[in-house]
């Protein structure tokens, strides 16, 4: 059972200002302006190809890895523009972590999957690493299931366990924000329920932005929802308002299933 959502704080942690993104000559994002509240869950919904995953990747500069990308506008994280020339991209990706659609554990043990990030960032003490591994797995609701087999290959876990492992791996490097790109689309309903409950619990300590095609999921877990269409945000508001009293005709048509 997914617990009731708590109200988020009113502190802004991420804000985009007139954000545009081009793939060569194609404009994939058009004048995106949105404020993300600290310790909130924001859902990004919309039809395939609408720009929601592209937008998600602008928030920790994952789109930098794609050839031919051009960005205009600002993404302000904790008061600083992440696209400024002197911004530390590695530190950005530590503070704004990413969980992908398909679970992608490393081909190594459960323990090494979690300790890998902290080691890369300079943690060498075995006792400290043990503590990070345990706490990260507890936060991701996986510890009780794997504590007696930490040296087992991570690929031996079920799909749902692998996704929670990937979340634990993200938590191990102490992010402030967690980006999730359809994290349950490849999972069965029971595993999906566990991930949703985990996401709501994580909101107490982290800010979460999730892309989902599942509007029921957005309604269950998110505080605010942004509806994307053709590279634009058509509407963004508290989730209950957007689903039950949309202000935009296109939003109403989408959530009622008239297109998608």
From Swiss-Prot:
It is an enzyme of class 7 (translocase). Keywords: ATP-binding, Cell inner membrane, Cell membrane, Membrane, Nucleotide-binding, Phosphate transport, Translocase, Transport. It is a peripheral membrane protein. Pfam families: ABC_tran. It is found in: Cell inner membrane. It catalyses: phosphate(out) + ATP + H2O = ADP + 2 phosphate(in) + H(+). Gene3D superfamilies: P-loop containing nucleotide triphosphate hydrolases. One of its GO terms (cellular component) is plasma membrane. GO terms for biological process: phosphate ion transmembrane transport. SMART domains: AAA. ATP binds at residues 46-53. Its EC number is 7.3.2.1. It comes from the Bacteria. GO terms for molecular function: ATP binding; ATP hydrolysis activity; ATPase-coupled phosphate ion transmembrane transporter activity. InterPro entries: AAA+_ATPase, ABC_transporter-like_ATP-bd, ABC_transporter-like_CS, P-loop_NTPase, PstB-like. Belongs to the ABC transporter superfamily. Phosphate importer (TC 3.A.1.7) family. The complex is composed of two ATP-binding proteins (PstB), two transmembrane proteins (PstC and PstA) and a solute-binding protein (PstS). This is Phosphate import ATP-binding protein PstB.
């Amino acid at each position: 059972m997914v617990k009731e959502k708590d109200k988020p704080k009113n502190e802004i942690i991420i804000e985009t200002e007139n954000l545009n993104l081009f793939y060569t000559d194609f404009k994939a994002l058009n004048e995106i302006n949105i404020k993300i509240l600290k310790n909130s869950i924001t859902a990004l919904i919309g039809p395939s190809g609408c720009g929601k995953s592209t937008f998600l990747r602008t928030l920790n500069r994952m789109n930098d890895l794609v050839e031919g990308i051009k960005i205009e506008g600002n993404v302000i994280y904790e008061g600083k523009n992440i696209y400024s020339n002197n911004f530390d991209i590695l530190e950005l990706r530590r503070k704004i972590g990413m969980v992908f659609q398909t679970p992608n554990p490393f081909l190594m043990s459960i323990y090494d999957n979690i300790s890998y990030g902290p080691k890369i960032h300079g943690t060498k003490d075995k006792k400290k690493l043990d503590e990070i591994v345990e706490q990260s797995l507890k936060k991701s609701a996986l510890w009780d299931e794997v504590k007696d087999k930490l040296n087992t290959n991570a690929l031996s876990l079920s799909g749902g366990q692998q996704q929670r492992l990937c979340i634990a791996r993200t938590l191990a490097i102490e992010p402030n924000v967690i980006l999730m790109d359809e994290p349950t689309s490849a999972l069965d309903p029971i595993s999906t329920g566990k991930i949703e409950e985990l996401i709501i619990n994580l909101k107490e300590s982290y800010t979460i932005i999730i892309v989902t095609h599942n509007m029921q999921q957005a309604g269950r877990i998110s505080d605010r929802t942004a509806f994307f269409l053709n590279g634009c945000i058509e509407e963004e508001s508290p989730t209950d308002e957007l689903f039950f009293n949309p202000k935009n005709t296109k939003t109403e048509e989408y959530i009622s299933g008239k297109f998608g």
